[in-house]
Every structure is written in C-alpha cells, then in structure tokens.
Amino acid sequence: SAFRELVNPLLIIEQIYQRTGMKIEILSSAEQHFLGYKSIAAIEKGFKKMIQKGTAILDVGGGSLQVSLFDKDALVTTQGLKMGSLRIRQRLQELEKTTIHYDKLVEEFIRNDLMSFQRLYLKDKEIRNVILMGDFITDMIFQEEMEDRIITREEFMKRYEDTVGKSVDLLAQEMEIDPEYASLVVPTMVVCRNFIDIFNAESLWAPGVSLLDGIAYDFAEKKKFLKSVHNFENDILVTSKNIAKRYSSSKSHIQGTMNLCLNIFDSMKKVHGMGARERLLLQIAALLHDCGKYISMEKVSECSYQIIMSTDIIGLSFMERQMIACAVRFNNSAFVYYDELYSMGIAIDRESYIKVAKMTAILRLANAMDRSHYQKVKGIKAVLKDRELPDDRGFCTGHFPGTGTAER
C-alpha cells in the first residue's frame, strides 16, 4: 500500500532497478488481498471448515485494512478502509502525547468508518468467526497462543486489556521488537477489537500466513502443481453479482445477458482467440453493464465506467478492471480508436485494447438480444457460416430485421 500511495512510483521503481537489478511490480489493492486470501485458503482443512459459517477475513496493513465477508463457502463482499495501523499512528502521533487513554483515542478516530461499514454491509449478516492476517505485527501479538492459533473472544479480550495500557517501550521490551513496530501494536489491537464487537464474533483465527504464501500458492496453482478445492473464480463472480445487486441491476437481465455472452464466446473461440481469463472478464462486464443506471439513466455508460473503476473487485488487476470498465462503457456509447483513449484518461496497451474491442462486440450483441429484458432469446448456438454469425433460430449478427446491416 505504501508503493500505491507514492506520488512518484515510477521514479522509485527505476531507482530500485538501477541499484539492485530487481524489477518491481506494484499489486493493486484487490490483487494484494486476493493473494492474501489465497494464502489462507492454502490451509485447506481449517479454511474450508471455517467459511461454512459466517466468517470475516480482517487483513490489517500499515496503510489500509481490507474486510472480506464469507457466508456458506462463498465470498459475499470485500471492502477496503483507510485505517491501517501505521496510518492511525501517524494521524494521532501528536495527540497521543496528551492522553493516557490512547486506545480510546484510536477508537474514536475509527468509529465513523466502522459505523458506516456496519450500516452498509453487515445488516442482517451473522459473523461468527474472524480470520486475522496482515503485517508481521499480527504474528507478534499472538506469538504465545496455542498451536492451532485459534482463540475465543474472551481470550482475545483478556490479551487486549493486558496490552493497550502498556507503554511503547514496555511492549517493545516484552515482545522483543523495535519500538517503531511496538507503536503499531495498540492501533492494531483496537481495530481488531472493534471489528470483533460489531461482528459479535465468537472466535479469532490468526493462521500466521503472509502475502508470500499466497504468491507461492497462486504460482503453484497456475502451473498446475496443485489443484485448489476452493473455486476462486466463483468468488470473483459472486462479488460482482453483489456489486450489481447494490446498484439495483435487473438480476434476470444480467444473468440472461451473461449466458448469451458465454454462448457467443464459446462458439467463436477460433475466431476471437481469447482464453479463460478474458471469458471471466466478459462475464463480469455482463454482470455490471447496467450498474450506471442507478445514478443516471441518461449517462449510463459514463456512470457505469466510473462505478467499476472506483470499486475494488477482489482478484482483478487494475488493467483488468479497466478492460471491463471500457467494455461496459462502449456497450452503450460510441467505440473509440486507440489513439483517442488517452484524451479520455484511459491508459491501456494495444493488446488489451483489441481484447476490449472483442469483448464489447460480444456484449453489445448479447445485450441487444435481451433489449426488452424479457429473456426471449435463450440457449442460442452460434456458428460461423460464410463469414456471418447466424444463430440456430435463423437470425444473424450481420443483419437483424428492422435494424439495417452491421459489418463484423
């Protein structure tokens, strides 16, 4: 998160490369937390069992905090909040000297964001378990806990009361860490305690994994060294469906449009040449193509684009999110040539631009087939015939009755 917030990241990355020869790639917030999530999933037995009931993953970083909610083995939502332990310490550094109740000060500082999160995303959800991960400070806090690293709410509260009243120097001495890191202990504990309170959670699990575990797991999965029992792509789709639901998109229409998109995509693989990842991006674009209507019926394209670009979708890179947003934008507005994108504030490479063009064409066709939102077209089979794409009902993408002719 520190790299993401730099005003001159390219210069810093270049300096690192010049001095060390290492090439740095900055992960988006959604990518970082998705890999963290995978690191927990690597402990398959404990993770699978825990997420059967309402569970929250609390990823406490230095600059920000990510909360992911699970219910019945599915990821329901994930949200980022700017209340990392380092950020809190920096903001309250001067005030800390004026009070003997630093924990209460931290609690008041984060209360507004906590209440907003509870009002918007918890509602009637029951969260029984909290999985805690983040910076190594989390491991330091729970270094004396039992082997399975699961503690009850009562045990956590006992540790909390024993910790927050101590000075930074005393914490550094007891935990055998630098005072710089010891100063992050109280903010971390206060954040954890307040989330446990609003969740009304019964137990806390600190698996002791890191981002490196997630990167290793992701690499092994992509190279087919192992097969995960958990469906991560389904989590991305469920999250996208919940975003669409939040913006009151028609469930039947977006589901129908997505199915039509997949039918066309799968039937035309030899023509468009796109793979499984682009298929997933197309599904997400179909699910979110109507979300802008929640803000403006007149400026659907622009509003949909801004919503998607402003929403972290776990598991997607910034470039992938941009591709989805562009496909959704050009679904209703005029498609623009590559050289015009920069004037619109859109920065994608040429390869991604071609993929956006193909995704947009498929999305436009599928959306047109359900213009009435009655799902009259179902179960089509697309075939290529004489350089035209007719479906099994005799219609053709090159010519629709009453609409004129379009070139593919």
Which stretches of residues belong to each language-model region?
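Short glycine-aspartate micro-motif
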Residues: 55-59
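Amphipathic alpha-helical domain-onset/packing element
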Residues: 365-366, 406-408
